[in-house]
Swiss-Prot record:
pH dependence (UniProt free text): Optimum pH is near neutral pH.
Mutation effect (S117V): Cannot transport Mn(2+) and loses some activity towards Co(2+)
A UniProt-annotated Pfam family: Zip
Reported impact of H148N: Binds Zn(2+) and Cd(2+). Retains binding of Fe(2+) at the high affinity M2 site, but loses Fe(2+) at the M1 site. Decreases Zn(2+) and Fe(2+) uptake
Protein name as annotated: Zinc transporter ZupT
Compartment list: Cell inner membrane
Transmembrane segments: 5-25, 33-53, 61-81, 109-129, 137-157, 171-191, 195-215, 236-256
Length: 257
């Protein structure tokens, strides 16, 4: 099994961490969840804009028009899919001040699971493609994806457990969204494999960079602010950028990057 595929599987499996937290009743503080989402956004933004897009543009045979065009395509593609998907977000379930009826919770959780699954599928592809092109960047993307998968698993498992009283059912529903990400990585592994030219890989990387930027500014940062409105998610973003940037410098200094 390839290392990029293993990274994708581990990132998707992080959903189960949130699921177990949801059924065990040990919910992390909103401040910690918000910081982790901002941290993940910072990692994604720095890797996308400072590493992935420049690397794609520098690839042999890649034209600036194609490179920037694929980046814009990734941005617009994300926003297009976001408008088409069911608009239930983790904060819709994590911040209920009045406890809804069990059936209402279950229905909302199912819609949320569907939306997150469709949203996670291309993330699995993105993680695999990035790690296949550059393993160093793949580690960073996998870490960022794993960090924001934890509150997603928590957001689904908690309400389903409240509605059904079954820990197994709650973990199952939460795990579906994580499995969708793993499925995306497996399909990318089966379809792409080694039969892809450097230009095509660079074009895909540019599109993935656009998707990651859109995900960070449209989903992760607003979600962090909604989960913890009393604190600025920018602190998490800055920390994520700083840690990722410092680690990249260390790797490059050591001759690994």
């Amino acid at each position: 099994m390839s290392v990029p595929l293993i990274l994708t599987i581990l990132a998707g499996a992080a959903t189960f961490i949130g699921a177990f937290l949801g059924v065990l009743g040990q919910k992390p503080s909103n401040r910690l969840l918000a910081f982790s989402l901002g941290f993940a956004a910072g990692i994604m933004l720095l890797i996308s804009l400072m590493e992935m897009l420049p690397a794609a543009l520098a690839a042999e045979g890649m034209s600036p028009v194609l490179g920037y065009g694929m980046f814009i395509f990734g941005l617009l593609g994300y926003f297009g899919l976001d408008r088409m998907l069911p608009h239930a977000h983790p904060q819709d379930l994590m911040q209920k001040s009045v406890q809804p009826l069990p059936k209402s919770i279950k229905r909302t959780a199912i819609l949320l699971t569907l939306g997150i699954s469709l949203h996670n599928f291309p993330e699995g592809i993105a993680t695999f493609v990035t790690a296949s092109s550059n393993l160093e960047l793949g580690f960073g993307i996998a870490l960022a994806v794993a960090l924001h998968n934890i509150p997603e698993g928590l957001a689904v498992a908690g309400p389903v457990y409240a509605a059904t009283g079954s820990k197994r059912t709650a973990i199952l529903w939460a795990g579906i969204s994580g499995l969708a990400e793993i499925l995306g990585g497996v399909l990318a592994w089966l379809i792409l494999g080694s039969m892809i030219s450097p230009v095509v890989m660079a074009a895909i990387m540019a599109a993935v960079a656009g998707i990651m930027v859109a995900l960070s500014v449209d989903e992760l940062m607003p979600l962090a602010k909604e989960i913890d409105p009393n604190n600025n998610p920018s602190y998490g973003v800055l920390c994520g950028m700083s840690v990722m940037g410092f680690s990249l410098v260390l790797l490059q200094t050591a001759g690994i990057g």
